[in-house]
Design a protein with these regions (language model features):
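Aromatic-rich peripheral "rim/lid" segments of glycoside hydrolase catalytic domains that contact
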Residues: 92-101, 121-171
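Glycoside hydrolase catalytic-domain groove-lining segments
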Residues: 57-98, 120-129
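Alpha-helical elements of Rossmann-like donor-binding domains used by nucleotide-donor carbohydrate transfer enzymes
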Residues: 13-14, 40, 70, 113-118, ...
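Distinct, well-ordered alpha-helical segments
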Residues: 11, 33-49, 64-75
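Active-site cradle of extracellular carbohydrate-active enzymes
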Residues: 14-15, 19, 26-44, 54
């Protein structure tokens, strides 16, 4: 995430160059607190008839992962890429961050119990093309601590069958 994102006008000034590549284009991210920024960006791209093929979300949510259809429809039926995913937000003290934030077995189990449902929702959503777990938060949320210590959620994630990501019919 970028704490000082460019304004929408600056991004749009560069967008035509990106469209010329012919590659699929992903929106700017929905960094924390940026719904209005993302709304303005998508509205302006659509108003101009420009391409934006994919919606990029950062999901530091305590709930709502089962409602990806809302974001898909709100932002013009674009496939969703979640580039940062964690159960909760450290700055809101919710989700796994409502704990003491240690790598304890109890916290690992709590995170695993929640993340199993979240992964299941995302893996079964026709609107989510891909997602990436954000591992750079407190120890209580880690998939991998250090270079080799998998958490319970990390072990689950390592063996999880997520299915096909890209679906041409949604393009």
């Amino acid at each position: 995430a970028d704490d000082r994102p460019q304004d929408v006008a600056t991004i749009l000034d560069q967008w035509q160059e990106l469209m010329r590549t012919g590659l699929r284009l992903c929106s700017e991210s929905s960094h924390d607190g940026s719904w209005a920024h993302l709304d303005e960006f998508i509205a302006e791209v659509d108003r101009r008839g420009w391409r934006c093929d994919i919606l990029d979300l950062h999901c530091y949510w305590a709930s709502g992962f089962d409602n990806m259809k809302y974001y898909y429809e709100k932002y013009g039926n674009r496939q969703i890429w979640i580039r940062e995913l964690v159960w909760g937000a450290s700055w809101n003290d919710n989700g796994i961050f409502a704990t003491d934030r240690t790598f304890s077995t109890a916290n690992q189990q709590k995170n695993l119990d929640a993340m199993k449902g979240i992964f299941n929702s995302l893996n079964n959503s026709p609107y989510v093309e891909r997602y990436a777990y954000w591992n750079s938060e407190a120890d209580c949320s880690k998939l991998l601590r250090g270079e080799s210590e998998l958490s319970l959620t990390g072990k689950y994630f390592q063996t999880m069958q997520s299915g096909m990501a890209y679906r041409k019919e949604y393009e």
